[in-house]
Amino acid sequence: MPLPSEVEKAARSGSEYELYKALLLSFGKRGDKAFEYLKRSKVKRYKDFFVVVGKEEYVVEGGFCTCPDFLVNLKGKSPCAHIIAVEVAKITGKYDYIDAYYVDYPDILRKKK
């Protein structure tokens, strides 16, 4: 999903204020939520997927998100806050890299107990 040019420009500028302003003007409430996910380090990059931690963990891949907002309300017509956060994180590098496959993550947790 391509971001609006003003959001891309703001993301590359390094200015949190400019990024927040661009996200808010372009996406409204969803832009505000996306900024919060980025600010609070809620975007995770696994070997296989990006995951955004909100009320639950939502998998984001190729313009698709597993969150109810995307699946029910938006039906793929507009990006949810999780997709926006991931696209900005790809530009800024503001995500935590986890050297594991997300699909195997529950197995990793079980082995540690």
From Swiss-Prot:
Domain of life according to the entry: Archaea
InterPro entries: Znf_SWIM
GO MF, any single term: zinc ion binding
UniProt KW Zinc keyword: yes
Record's keyword annotation contains Zinc-finger: yes
Zn-finger segments (SWIM-type): 49-91
Entry keywords, A to Z: Metal-binding, Zinc, Zinc-finger
Listed name of the protein: Uncharacterized protein AF_1109
